């Protein structure tokens, strides 16, 4: 089947939720990069390259006039992604995707994104982190924010509770976690914030 549209008002709400999610993910990722910059300033350059990634730009467009008093048309405008689309991390498990196999360069990006999840988890004191990382080149899109039991679908429909609950046991610290001296993951009440 082809692409399907939701009823107009439901689609507008979905667009608003998607734009808010991208705003939150961009902000959370900037916080992780601020941590990285501060640590590099303190320790010097790491012995490996830091990928320069960002979430694509997105906006909600709304038509000025409506087709009826109860219906407002809205559209989501996204930056174009060029190149092959890659799924780096699924929102159910905090490890690099293995199907289809990632190239060496894609695996390095996935490993870095696993590290950013660790940073985000510590920065939020065990409350949240970005997952479902995917995109192409240095652009990321269509993420999810996994949270503790703060609320059902607080940031979107992809908040996989089981994925969040498994994070501290399934995350495997890598060269980034070690070089940036991240505290090991423990129960959220004992995890030190960055």
PLM features: what roles do these ranges have?
Residues 1-110, 140-194:
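Conserved structural core of kinase catalytic domains
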Residues 111-113, 117-148:
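Catalytic-loop of the protein kinase fold
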